Amino acid sequence: MANTGCLSPGAFLSKVPEFFQTANEKHITVRLTAKRLIEHDPVEGNLEFDSTNHPDYDVSKKASEISVSSRSDREYPLLIRMSYGSHDKKTKCSTVVKASELDQFWQEYSSVFKGGMQNLIKKKKKKSKNGTISKTGKKNKVAKKN
């Protein structure tokens, strides 16, 4: 497994075209994930992991319905991961983007990301016997009447 570790946002953006080029040549999938980064404190614990007693730190839909007098104004960095391959042949890298730099990063990321999707081929839809095309590409079964 090749792990380039946590790169700077600029270095990560320079790796994106390399990942897409390799994935296009090998005909494999590139996986991209993004999530809020919370550093775990094993001694004191984190309020973010205790949504029952501290619902203001929970970002789920249920927590947004609860009115809370004191809300968390803390800004969290965003962890972005990219990988392709599987098991021993997996190649991956990641970056951490601060909330204040997020808008600029997304603009650069989207332009680089779109450039890597040029080799996508639109799937051909299959026609069924009655001439209609299903959304899944499978034939529509028509029940015969006796």
Curated annotation (Swiss-Prot):
Annotated segments matching region Disordered: 121-146
Keyword set includes Transferase: no
UniProt entry keywords in alphabetical sequence: Cytoplasm, Nucleus, Phosphoprotein, Ribonucleoprotein, RNA-binding, Signal recognition particle
Cellular localization per UniProt: Cytoplasm; Nucleus
Record field: compositional bias (Basic residues): 136-146
Classification via Pfam families: SRP14 (PF02290)
A GO MF term: 7S RNA binding
S-S pairs: none
Main location class: cytoplasm
Modified-residue entries (Phosphoserine), positions: S8
GO biological process terms on file: protein targeting to ER; SRP-dependent cotranslational protein targeting to membrane, signal sequence recognition; SRP-dependent cotranslational protein targeting to membrane, translocation
Family annotation (SUPFAM superfamilies): Signal recognition particle alu RNA binding heterodimer, SRP9/14
GO CC list: nucleus; signal recognition particle, endoplasmic reticulum targeting
Function: Component of the signal recognition particle (SRP) complex, a ribonucleoprotein complex that mediates the cotranslational targeting of secretory and membrane proteins to the endoplasmic reticulum (ER). The SRP complex is required for the cotranslational protein translocation for ER import and preferentially recognizes strongly hydrophobic signal sequences. It is involved in targeting the nascent chain-ribosome (RNC) complex to the ER and is proposed to participate in the arrest of nascent chain elongation during membrane targeting.
Family recorded in the similarity comment: Belongs to the SRP14 family.
Note: Present with 8000 molecules/cell in log phase SD medium.
Assembly and binders: Component of a fungal signal recognition particle (SRP) complex that consists of a 7SL RNA molecule (scR1) and at least six protein subunits: SRP72, SRP68, SRP54, SEC65, SRP21 and SRP14. At least SRP14, SRP21, SRP68 and SRP72 are proposed to get assembled together with scR1 RNA as a pre-SRP complex in the nucleolus which is exported to the cytoplasm. SRP14 binds RNA as a homodimer.
Name used for this protein in its record: Signal recognition particle subunit SRP14
Gene assigned in the entry: SRP14
